Each structure stands twice: as structure tokens, then as C-alpha cells.
């Protein structure tokens, strides 16, 4: 569910809304799968569906989504620093679901020491 909310936050970022088919396309899933997950996010109070198939994040959805993007950025930068590459996306995607807030904040502080703020 976090991957969907993270992507919704990215997609809604510029215009404030997105659509299920764009979400499905970006996550490389079927629109029906994305629609089911959006239903779950709606039940959690993170997303609201509007007329014409528009999806918008609720204030709570925005808050959680922004944290997920932050966590992703911190972890990705830390892995890139450790491995000296920019291709750590797969590892980031795997690890980010198991890392707690305290660890994220500690990694962010460590990155600041190296003058590498999270993106």
C-alpha cells in the first residue's frame, strides 16, 4: 500500500490530482489492481475520489505520502553513499518498507554530516 501512496504523492504533486490509469501505468500494474488498492486507501482516509475519475490525497494522505517520499530519498542517498553509485533504487524499494522512523532520522543526520541532504 505504501508504494501506491508514495506514487500518488508524486503524481498529485504538480497538479494536485491524478487518475487511476496513470497510477497503474507508473507502478506497472493493471488498472483493476490499482483501483482495488485505491479503494483501500480511501477506506483508510488517505485518498478521495472525485468526479471524472480524479484522485486527490486527503491532508492525512499528503502527510503520510510526503514522509514516504522523504524516507525513500534518505535511504536512497545513504545507499548511494555507501556503494558510490546512483543505481540503488531496487535496494531502496526493498528496504524502505522495513525501516523505522528513528533509523530514517538517524540516516538523515548522517547524510547531513557528509553534506548530502536527502532529495
Residue ranges of each PLM-predicted region?
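Key DNA-contact positions within bacterial/archaeal DNA-binding proteins
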Residues: 32
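A short, conserved structural fragment
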Residues: 42-50
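Key DNA-contacting residues within the recognition helix of helix-turn-helix
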Residues: 35-37
Amino acid at each position: 500500500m505504501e508504494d501506491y501512496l508514495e506514487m500518488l504523492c508524486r503524481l498529485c504533486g504538480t497538479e494536485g490530482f491524478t487518475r487511476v490509469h496513470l497510477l497503474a501505468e507508473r507502478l506497472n500494474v493493471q488498472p483493476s489492481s490499482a483501483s482495488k488498492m485505491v479503494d483501500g486507501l480511501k477506506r483508510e482516509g488517505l485518498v478521495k475520489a472525485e468526479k471524472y475519475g480524479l484522485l486527490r490525497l486527503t491532508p492525512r494522505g499528503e502527510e503520510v505520502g510526503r514522509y514516504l517520499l522523504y524516507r525513500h530519498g534518505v535511504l536512497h542517498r545513504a545507499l548511494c553513499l555507501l556503494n558510490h553509485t546512483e543505481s540503488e533504487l531496487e535496494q531502496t524499494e526493498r528496504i524502505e518498507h522495513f525501516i523505522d522512523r528513528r533509523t530514517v532520522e538517524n540516516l538523515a543526520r548522517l547524510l547531513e554530516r557528509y553534506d548530502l541532504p536527502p532529495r
